[in-house]
Amino acid sequence: LDRDAAVDRAVRLVTGLTLWLGLLLVTYWWVANGGVTDLAHWESGLTSLGRITGLWSADLLLVQVLLMSRLPPLEHAFGRDRLARIHRVVGFLSFYLLITHIVLIIVGYASGQWSVVLSTVWDLITNYGGILLAFGGTACLIMVVITSVKAARRRLRYESWHLLHLYGYLGVGLALPHQLWTGQEFLQSPAATVYWWTLWAAAAGTVVLWRVWLPLWRSARYRLRVAGVVRESADVVSVYLTGHRLDRLPLRAGQFINIRFLSQPGWTRANPFSLSIAAGQPHAADHGKSRRRWQHTTGVPAAGHVCAVRGTVRAP
């Protein structure tokens, strides 16, 4: 346990240092590329501030993707609840910087003349590579942010909120062509290029590996299916899962997991559960206050339905 605690402390320290080092690096490259010098003039100063806010936003945007990629060392060191809180803070900060970046760039290119802002936006969209895609990505991120506000989130089912949240990945992906084609800081030096490509590759790789491939591989390997559904009380339902060699499935009693019921409508929605019986026992029971919601949307999962389960624990 002492060794695990030491490893977790080291992971938290390295994560914090890496976050700040990344922001310092992109700031350094901005300065080296004349960012501070450009502040001497009105128009160039606005676009220069637009560039640095865009760099900070892009860096934090990819960091928050990494934070919620289900990377086991991060999950173990911070815990999912704490990671979610950090993700929320970093995400909103990145979004505010993104909006600031857009406003400063548009006003800077319009030379501070509000009367030509609309024509400037049209010029950027039609004559600068990747800008239209970037606007589309921004629209996706705006939708994610709006649905993340507590007042809006309370009105949404968890499954619907989770599905809408996935559009954030589309928003991130649509920003890449803009950085490649018009972002001078992205390609200004070999070091900057290596840094950005490494950050993009790390974000994409961890998401594909831990959020997509691993759940699918585990579901195929362990052949998870619904063995039965038992109503425990008015608002609690137990879903019993069965499968192949569940003693090797790295899940523990008390753990939070997401389950998708693949062979029924609504299979794209992840349903949150807590695992009540350890994998490897005759059945793995998952309890959640979800029965009434299923009855009115996707239907209560029936025995035999194929499942995809996502959850991570430290390997023994």
Language-model regions: role of each:
Residues 57, 257, 314:
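Short, flexible micro-motifs
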Residues 157, 191-198, 209-231:
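Canonical alpha-helical transmembrane segment with a positive-inside/aromatic-interface signature
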Residues 1-2, 244-245, 249, 312:
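Short, intrinsically disordered terminal tails adjacent to the first/last structured region
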Residues 50, 216-306:
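Ferredoxin-reductase
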Residues 309-316:
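A short, basic/flexible loop-to-alpha-helix module at the beginning of a structural domain
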Residues 95, 262-264, 312:
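Short, surface-exposed secondary-structure boundary micro-motifs
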Residues 4-208:
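Membrane-embedded alpha-helical bundles of multi-pass integral membrane proteins
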